[in-house]
Amino acid sequence: MGGESDKQKKPDYFLVSVSNRRNLELCIKHAMAGFTNSINGLWTFFDIDVGDYVSFLYGARVRNLYKVVEKKAYKNAEKLPPWPPVTFKMSGKTYYFPFRLFLSQERLLDEPMVRPEFSYVAENLLLRGGYRKTHFHADSITFYNISQMGMPYEGENESLHLEAETFEPKIVFKKENETIPEKFYFREIILQSLVRKKIPNTILGEILERFGMLQNASEFEVLGEKALPEGYVDIFIKLRHPTASNRYILVEVKTGKAQRKDIRQLLEYMSEYGREAVGGVLVARDFPRKANADGVVFVNYRFDDLDVEGEYAFEKLLELLRLEVVV
């Protein structure tokens, strides 16, 4: 029950939240998405890969369909077009957009989120605090639906050529080594993204076997955060093409040692899906002694040969990450 190889990786589809109408117009004009010098901005930049697809989300409407063709992080981005820096009144903090996605427009569309075809993402949007979230990972059914909306795009966008120095953002494991936006301290949402990308090619088949599932790992998709009425689950695994009923596996990720309350919380989340929730997975560095729970698989994570004084690119951490199902 192996997972998909990297060569066979199916593209993911994301809706990217835009903060105001002017920024939306600039995103569309230049076929570019930008993310702030914050941990959420970095997370989005890491989460979305070249070859994935995105649409813009603003005013409860979904705009256009694009393929991601390039990713770049820019130094001194506060001086770069097209978006001006944004200062928030409550915190007084100013954010700018060093993390950029360069896009190729595939379809022209302007659709309301209330359409049933967007129900997977709309539920996340309503339950997860609206546009404060940077991006929403949609499922294959949503991507299939939007690929038939609107019309093929045959025009040309106004490319923006930036003559500016770039850098590769790094993750550090000591807070004092953090120098934003070049170096960010390791946080749980970064681990979430790493685990989401690692699971399909490593332990998904073993997890399915633990739950007595007969389907192949390739029949499932591993999605990002999923909002629930009582919270949210870090990673959501479901059938790509369900018939009659679906099968869900809920995954929670902890950077340190998992607590018994984390197990209880995961069981509560699973109960919200009833019989369609076949099990839960708790990923952590360590677990309480004699930890066990019906329907929960424990997975230990580690980074091979990690130097806590070092700095690591996301792809290097993905390479070093090891996931091991605890027997």
UniProtKB/Swiss-Prot annotation:
A Gene Ontology molecular function term of the record: nucleic acid binding
InterPro entries reported in the protein's UniProt record: tRNA_endonuc-like_dom_sf
Protein name: Uncharacterized protein AF_1446
Organism: Archaeoglobus fulgidus (strain ATCC 49558 / DSM 4304 / JCM 9628 / NBRC 100126 / VC-16)
